[in-house]
A protein has these predicted regions:
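A structural signal for conserved, well-ordered secondary-structure elements
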Residues: 95
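N-terminal beta1-alpha1 cap of cysteine-dependent amidohydrolase-like domains
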Residues: 1-92, 100-107, 118-119, 126
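Pocket-forming structural segment of enzyme catalytic cores
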Residues: 105-150
Length: 150
């Protein structure tokens, strides 16, 4: 996936109860690709052929730690995991990242921050190695990125 191929990009966006960022993501994808992405309800068991599945933010099933656990067990996530296993791209944003962690698609677990309070700051990340991913294709090993974290 490259910037020049965005016009042909087929995108699906998952929708869960309580989600509130799926429509924002739909607008962003449509503006970027000039194509309307498919919105896929969490109870669906399959995906139409797509190049990218986005699991957006927005507090699926509630606003608390491990809220992604319920979403991660929704029928659509089996289809998302199958898509990824076939080499398809998957992007998890905010709560969507939590969902991908809860499904085991991403390693590790999420924990509460040490202060138990909302934190909003910039964090500098450094790429450890290059990965064969459309999201990191333009990055080199050792490159620093300033990322907002909230």
């Amino acid at each position: 996936m490259t910037l020049s191929s965005l016009a042909s990009l087929r995108v699906a966006i998952t929708v869960f109860p309580g989600s509130n960022c799926d429509r924002d993501m739909m607008v962003a994808v449509e503006q970027l690709t000039n194509r309307r992405p498919a919105l896929v309800w969490h109870k669906e068991a399959s995906l139409d052929p797509v190049d990218l599945v986005i699991v957006p933010g927005g507090f699926s099933f509630g606003d608390y730690l491990r809220c992604g656990a319920l979403a991660g067990r929704s029928p659509i996530m089996n289809a998302v995991m199958d898509h990824a296993a076939r080499g398809g791209a998957v992007l998890g944003v905010c709560n969507g990242f939590q969902v991908l962690t809860e499904t085991g698609m991403l390693p590790g677990v999420l924990i509460r921050n040490a202060g138990l309070r909302f934190s909003c700051r910039m964090v500098r990340l450094e790429t450890a190695e290059t990965m064969p991913s459309p999201f990191t294709a333009g990055l080199t090993a050792g490159q620093s990125l300033d990322i907002p974290v909230a």
